[in-house]
Structures are given as C-alpha cells and as structure tokens.
Regions:
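C-terminal non-catalytic interaction/assembly regions of soluble proteins
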Residues: 189-343
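Structural signal for hydrophobic packing residues in well-ordered secondary-structure cores
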Residues: 51, 55, 96-104, 128-133, ...
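Gly-rich Lys/Arg/Thr-decorated short loops/hinges at beta-loop-alpha junctions or inter-strand turns
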Residues: 14-33
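A conserved active-site cap/scaffold subdomain adjacent to cofactor or substrate pockets
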Residues: 87-195, 211, 215
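Active-site glycine-rich loop that binds ribose-phosphate moieties when present
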Residues: 37-51
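A glycine- and small-aliphatic-rich helix-loop capping segment at beta-alpha/alpha-beta transitions
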Residues: 15-17, 72-83
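Single conserved hydrophobic/aromatic residue that forms the stacking wall/gate
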Residues: 1-6, 11
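Gly/Ser/Thr-rich loops at beta-strand to alpha-helix junctions
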Residues: 1, 62-68, 285-287
Length: 343
C-alpha cells in the first residue's frame, strides 16, 4: 500500500492576508503574476493518517523534515494530538536525524579532523523511551555521536531555543540536556512543548529576473592585483556597451567570495597569493542586458592582464527564481491523504 499526502490552498482567495516577507519589506501584489510555485510546510497529520490506513510507504509533498519522523512515532506510541511534550520530543528526535550523516559527524565544526572513518560515515539512530531519548549509530559505520556533535545539530536552524516553531508543536529546548552516556551514545532530556502555531510557513517561488556569472583565474605573481585590474577593464567595456544592470557583484574566490566585508584584504594577505579567481555576477530584469558581458570575458585571456585563464565554459544567461518566505493561516490549507494499492 502506497500513501500519498498533498495539500491545497488558493493563493488568490486571500481574504485579507498580506503575506509579509520574512526577509524584507515588499508588497505581495507585486509578484502575484510572476509566481511559479507555492509550497506550504505541512506537519505530520497526513503521514500519520496514511500509516493508520496501512500504508507501507508514504510519499508527501513539502512537509517539515522533522514531521517525517514524528508521524511514525506518534502513530506507534499513540500520543494524543495535544501531548505537547511528547510531540516536542518526537520533533527534536527527528531534528537530530533529518540531515542524515550531519548528525553523526558530517559537517562537524568542533573537531572534524578526528571524526573516525568519515569515508564510511553512518546515519544517526534515535531510541525513544517514555521521557528521554538517545542518539546512537550502527557500530560498523564511521562517524561520531558525542555531546558536541549533537549540540551542533540540535541548534541548527533554531532562532529562539524557547520557541522553535514547527507545524506540529512549538518546541522549548532552552532547558534541554545533552549527556554522553556511552561510546557513540548521547541522551537528550528536558525537551518541552507548547501548542502549535496558528500559521504555517509558505515558500513562494517567483520570477525575479536574469543573471550571468563569469570567472577568470590569475596566477602568481600579483594574482590579486591582476584580477582586480581585469575587473576594471570589464567594467569599462560594459560602460561603452551601455549595459544597464540592476546589480553587479564582484568578488575574488580565495579571498572574499565567502567572507565579503570581513575578509582579510591586508597587503600581507594579498601579496603572495599563488592564484586568485575573479568572479563577476550580473543581475538584470532585462535578459538582453545580462548577455552583453558574455562575449567580453573569453578574449581577456590574451587581451587583458597576464597569467589569466578562462574556465568553466562560456557563461550563459540564467533565469533567477526568487523566494518569498511568509506564513499562511493554518485553516486555509487543506491536507489530503490517499491510499493507493500497488501490485
């Protein structure tokens, strides 16, 4: 038996909803005719319903990651819909499992050099009792389960430890305990729950414009100086061509492409670089404006500063799909589940 879970809502039948953007001020009406998709983060109910009807496998649309774990836990243990503490424990157990190997030493910042057998990294396992739960892993897999690795996973994506909002429960981990109780075994306690929010997270994807990204690498000596000068050359060429970009972002991979304004750009850091990659990203609502930069990049291997190489293939114009993160009233979303018998 195959369980199918989906949800429906009408974005145009808004009844006064304003869909405020989490990230910046904006008017939802401005993107209404540019929308490609809408995904509501639903909770565990539809999945649990399929399990109750005998589903062997459940396929769902967008759901909160931790809901995939809460549903079978609630179904098996028979937790009540308002048993907020147990629901919160189930959510946090799922939270520690949902990223796979990340919960067992992958992406581990504290002591990544000493994670055993990362080439054979296993996934974490949650074992729940009445009031606590433990995280472990299969003994024949690589990785590590320790207090620090679980703390990193426990806190990721959590803005307010006293109010971690999910579709199923408002989780309070502000007094949670994480204790090493054995080799590759950690016990979690003190997780509490409060009534779930009245809204659900809604992610709206919409057309925003166009972009192109070009890169040129430069070798020692004076790698950064040459890359910087090449950026000036490109900008002068674009001015002559009358390019009207809405945004141009110039960065130097190996220097500031990740750290931006806090990167070390001192003379000492720059003078002996073995190599430096110039990255120029252009954004415009007009596709033709983005295209103007493309034919100017490749010739700069020979028509620009010395020691340049062009890589990654010829740049191309790509559509930009932007995200409008917001919320929608819970009662506006209809969750449906069906059972399909497959032979």
């Amino acid at each position: 038996s195959l369980g199918l879970v989906g949800s429906e809502m009408c974005i145009r039948d808004r009844d006064g909803w304003t869909f405020p953007n989490f990230d910046y001020d904006g008017n939802f009406n401005d993107i209404l005719d540019k929308i490609y998709n809408c995904n509501v983060y639903i909770g565990h109910e539809g999945i649990e319903g399929c399990l109750a009807e005998g589903a062997d496998v459940v396929i769902t649309g967008r759901a909160a990651d931790s809901a995939l774990f809460l549903a079978p836990l609630k179904y098996e243990f028979g937790w009540a819909a308002d048993d907020w503490d147990n629901l919160a424990r189930g959510i946090m157990a799922g939270h520690l499992l949902e990223c796979g190997g990340q919960g067992a030493g992958g992406n581990y910042m504290y002591d990544w050099r000493n994670v055993p057998r990362m080439d054979e990294l296993g996934f974490p396992i949650a074992e729940l009792t009445d009031d606590t739960f433990e995280i472990t892993k299969a003994p024949d897999c690589g990785g590590i389960i320790c207090e620090q690795s679980c703390k990193e996973q426990f806190l990721y994506e959590v803005h307010d430890p006293a109010n971690y909002l999910t579709p199923d429960v408002n989780v309070d981990i502000s007094h949670a305990t994480i204790t090493q109780v054995g080799d590759n075994r950690v016990r979690i306690g003190g997780v509490k729950g409060k009534p779930r929010p009245d809204t659900l997270k809604l992610c709206v994807g919409y057309h925003k414009g166009w972009k192109t990204v070009s890169m040129l690498s430069f070798a020692w000596p004076d790698a950064y100086e040459k890359a910087q000068y090449c950026a000036e050359v490109i900008m002068k060429k674009m001015q002559r061509r009358g390019m009207k970009a809405d945004d141009i972002h110039i960065s130097y991979i190996g220097l500031n492409s990740l750290h931006l304004g806090v990167a070390d750009m001192s003379e000492e850091a720059l003078k002996n670089l073995n190599e430096c990659v110039l990255r120029i990203a252009v954004f415009s609502e007009d596709k033709s404006e983005c295209a103007k930069i493309i034919p100017e990049i490749s010739p700069l291997q020979l028509n620009g500063p010395p020691g340049a190489s062009f890589f990654g293939g010829r740049a191309r114009v790509q559509e930009v799909m932007a995200l409008w993160p917001t919320t929608v009233p819970r009662d506006a979303v209809q969750v449906e589940s069906h059972i399909l018998e497959v032979k």
